[in-house]
């Protein structure tokens, strides 16, 4: 591209190299471009005494045209160097992407080694997150097929943004469509500091295909709650993906998908609430029955009434935490109550029954308070249910 700068020279490469470095430092692009054709390829990749190569210096000085020429003269091995001598681990690509050098990035991407292209720097930037952030769709398209999934899903330190979120933010439709299938569930379901999901952001920007793909992926991941997320703060407070999609022209099919998802989500929540009620009902009934028994003990007749109540309640709590079926326990408690006429006998049999279950499960209980203080009573205990 810059062949007209070529000329013969008998000057030693070392002297040319020093001139090149000084010209780059002084941002003298014309002199740099005149010197490059006179030098050998290996000289152009050589670091100076401070560890800086001509390319890293040119990137630092924002000499985009110089960078493009240097990349064209360097070997694949030389452009794949990972700079570890500085505090932040960088490659030529990450440095170029930070500067927004589109041409340099496009030339580097297909030639770099897998290790270099998948570098994660100290700020958790990757080649892909930087390219998406700098709105370089063609570079992203080249990167995605050659990057590891775990690197694609890295989120940068400051805003915890994934490559997909950056691509949505910059309206990079094709890039988003490539990323959605390989993005993790965690990143797909990410809610940002403004309380927006990726789906909400895509709907807000009118990215129809991206919305459709996100909905499909989120349904596949059973993330109906994220699909139906409602923003709780800021200017968009009260908005959802559905309400934002309804404001976009040509989004009728997207709205239909979201409405269907909303109905499924409501049904799912209703079933969850019903299940919780069913699970809590036996415990409620058990509690009522125990309280009724305790109330039958006349106040003052037994000094350890509160201890009894605490002991039994603690055992039931432990059984519940260990995923026991309280419905079955409730049925057995009813048998105990029906088979024992004396209140003290009922309570003693009840504790004995709970202890049997606990002992069978080798549960280590802190509460081993016995009801024997109630006195000797005749107990009828039914264990026919094999608990």
Swiss-Prot record:
Full protein name: Putative ankyrin repeat protein RBE_0984
InterPro entries, per the entry: Ankyrin_rpt (IPR002110), Ankyrin_rpt-contain_sf (IPR036770)
Coiled-coil spans in chain: 251-278, 311-352
Keywords tagged on the record: ANK repeat, Coiled coil, Repeat
ANK repeats: 50-79, 88-119, 123-154, 159-188, 210-239
SUPFAM superfamilies: Ankyrin repeat
């Amino acid at each position: 591209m810059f062949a007209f700068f070529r000329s013969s020279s008998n000057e030693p490469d070392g002297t040319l190299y020093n001139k090149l470095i000084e010209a780059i430092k002084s941002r003298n692009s014309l002199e740099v471009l005149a010197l490059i054709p006179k030098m050998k390829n290996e000289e152009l990749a050589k670091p100076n005494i401070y560890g800086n190569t001509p390319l890293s210096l040119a990137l630092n000085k924002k000499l985009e045209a110089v960078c493009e020429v240097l990349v064209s003269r360097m070997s694949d091995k030389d452009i794949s160097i990972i700079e570890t001598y500085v505090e932040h681990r960088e490659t030529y690509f990450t440095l170029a992407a930070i500067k927004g050098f589109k041409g340099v990035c496009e030339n580097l991407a297909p030639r770099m080694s897998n290790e270099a292209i998948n570098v994660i720097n100290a700020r958790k930037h990757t080649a892909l997150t930087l390219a998406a952030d700098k709105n370089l769709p063609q570079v992203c398209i080249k990167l995605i097929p050659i990057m590891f999934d775990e690197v694609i899903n890295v989120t940068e330190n400051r805003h915890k943004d994934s490559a997909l979120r950056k691509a949505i933010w910059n309206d990079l439709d094709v890039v988003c469509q490539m990323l959605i299938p390989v993005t993790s569930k965690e990143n797909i379901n990410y809610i940002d500091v403004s309380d927006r999901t990726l789906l909400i952001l895509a709907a807000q920007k009118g990215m129809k295909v991206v919305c459709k793909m996100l909905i499909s992926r989120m349904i596949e991941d059973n993330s109906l709650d994220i699909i139906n997320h409602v923003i709780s703060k800021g200017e968009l407070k009260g908005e959802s993906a559905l309400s934002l999609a309804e404001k976009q022209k040509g989004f009728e099919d997207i709205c239909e998908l979201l409405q269907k998802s909303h109905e499924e989500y409501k049904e799912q929540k209703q079933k969850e609430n019903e299940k919780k009620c069913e699970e809590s009902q036996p415990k409620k009934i058990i509690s009522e029955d125990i309280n009724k028994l305790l109330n039958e003990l006349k106040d003052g007749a037994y000094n350890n009434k509160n201890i009894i109540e605490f002991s039994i309640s603690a055992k039931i709590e432990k059984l519940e935490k260990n995923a026991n079926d309280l419905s079955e326990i409730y049925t057995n408690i009813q048998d105990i109550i029906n088979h024992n006429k004396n209140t003290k006998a009922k309570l003693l049999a009840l504790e004995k029954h709970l202890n049997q279950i606990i002992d069978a499960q080798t549960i280590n209980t802190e509460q081993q308070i016995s009801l024997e203080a109630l006195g000797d009573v005749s107990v009828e205990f039914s264990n026919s249910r094999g608990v």
